[in-house]
Amino acid sequence: MLEFLRAYKSYDPAAKSLIEVFFLYPGPRALFIHRTAHFLYSIRLFFIARLLADISRTITGIEIHPGAQIGRRLVIDHGVGCVIGETAIIGDDCIIFHGVTLGGVKFDPVKRHPTIGNNVLIGTGAKVLGPITIGDRSKIGANSVVMKDLPPDSVIVAARSEILSKTIQ
């Protein structure tokens, strides 16, 4: 647990102490509860695991299914509105911003959520959907929608905004 608290503190210049990070940041609280819920899920205590996940979502605004596999030192920055699905796998040293969805596109009881490599950054509001793989060290820009595999070291961005008119009529 100390490892992911240190990851937050080293990432966020506004964090003044590990105590502040643990008690006042929603990401570490969601991840702490997820570790417990994931263990319960792995020993087939599904209801209790889902109950813990629901409590976490209520407290933090971050929804992580207890079946999701999360690597070391994940940083969920701000976090409100993040959704991480049941069969999602996230590697080590990743950063996820608020409003991100790691979601499925099918309802079959198979692998239906993304696999995220190590050292991946996923920007605000990005949607990564389906049983795809995001390669190590990739960066996904804000509000991007990704539905195909990305090789390692990829950078993907959503279409940029452009001014259509300078006056409102």
Name each model-derived stretch:
Residues T60, H65-P66, G71-R72, D77-E86, ...:
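Left-handed beta-helix
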Residues P109:
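Catalytic-pocket segment enriched in acidic/His residues
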Residues M1-T60, I168-Q169:
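Terminal amphipathic alpha-helical/low-complexity segments used for targeting or macromolecular assembly
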